[in-house]
Amino acid sequence: MGEFLIVIGVVIVIVAIIGLVLNARRAGKNSVPGSRRDPLASDQVAQGFGPRNLGPGAIVAYGGIDYVVRGTITLHQGSFVWWEHLLDGGDGAQWLGVEVDEGQLEITWWTTRRGHGLVPAPEVVLDDRVHREDESGAAQYSCEGTTGLPPQGQMRYRDYRTQDGSSLLSFEDWDGSGWELSSGRPMSPGELTVYPAPPAPGAPGYRA
């Protein structure tokens, strides 16, 4: 009788082990491995240049100069959003434009141009280079920090580029005040170092 009970116990243990192995195999077949993320996807690349990092109080290091972000303009055209950051630290008015267009992060270093006598046209020549109109439109804007603009309003723009895309122009009209011209050049993220802005009042991590 004792030997019979031992045999029954061994059989039960073997059946239990077989059941565990089969369940583990089924779980392995049904499980979906975690997918790896594209390191150059817009949400990955843009995080260092997004509104959480770039804003009033942030530092942008470029060409051996540390520029302080004095103010930020957030622009909305339908569902499309982009930012313009006023920089203090160099000669003249410098702006850093940031947008994600069709999944690609685009950064532009803009310089305000005065005394040029230019107005929007199909082609605009500046610095002996021909710029052709690339796009135009209108947007709503809101401001944070010091920008020289009202807290919110409307603007129009007409953007230009050279054939090789190395030189850009932008005419902007803020609330009907007249066209202002800026010249720009595309930047790569690796050319700049961003030291994040302090948290805004009421945001997580803010300290009075």
Show where each model-derived region lies.
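Mixed-charge, low-complexity intrinsically disordered regions
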Residues: 1-84, 88-208
